[in-house]
């Protein structure tokens, strides 16, 4: 199924296509419409099946559609079990949100916390 058929905005579809994807995977086709509709979802799929895009794309779209207001605050929080996965998920969010005003910040252990705190005070999506 094409990403535009899932209810994603033109700018998100463009960002996805610039990353080399034209068709959604089964997990994306099932998850994206449900998340966009505001439904809760618990999903599992094998490695490499597009799970990150399955939740990242609707999160980005929903945040883009919200009134941002004048106060900067955390809008979404994504938790991962490892620093490596946090970095990978963060990288994907940044690629997909390239046409938005969202600020995406990776936060994880093993590095100086002061810079991360500064970024947290300015950002909107964290993990």
Where are these regions (language model features)?
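Conserved pre-motif I regulatory segment
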Residues: 1-44
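Generic secondary-structure boundary/loop-capping signal
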Residues: 3, 33, 54-57, 82, ...
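Conserved nucleic-acid-binding Ia/Ib motif block in the N-terminal RecA-like helicase ATPase lobe
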Residues: 5, 10-21, 69-127
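Gly/Ser/Thr-rich beta-alpha loop segments that engage phosphate groups in nucleotides
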Residues: 22, 40, 50-52, 111-112
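Walker A/P-loop NTP-binding motif
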Residues: 29-41, 52-70, 87, 92-96
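The conserved Walker
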Residues: 45-49
């Amino acid at each position: 199924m094409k990403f535009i058929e899932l209810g994603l905005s033109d700018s998100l579809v463009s960002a996805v296509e610039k990353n080399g994807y034209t068709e959604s995977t089964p997990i994306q086709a099932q998850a994206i419409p449900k998340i966009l509709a505001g439904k809760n979802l618990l999903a599992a799929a094998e490695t490499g099946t597009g799970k990150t895009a399955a939740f990242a794309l609707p999160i980005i779209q929903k945040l883009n559609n919200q009134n941002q207001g004048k106060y900067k605050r955390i809008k979404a929080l994504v938790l991962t079990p490892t620093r490596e996965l946090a970095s990978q998920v963060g990288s994907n969010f940044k690629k997909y949100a390239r046409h938005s005003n969202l600020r995406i910040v990776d936060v994880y252990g093993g590095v100086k916390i002061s810079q991360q705190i500064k970024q947290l005070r300015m950002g909107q999506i964290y993990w």
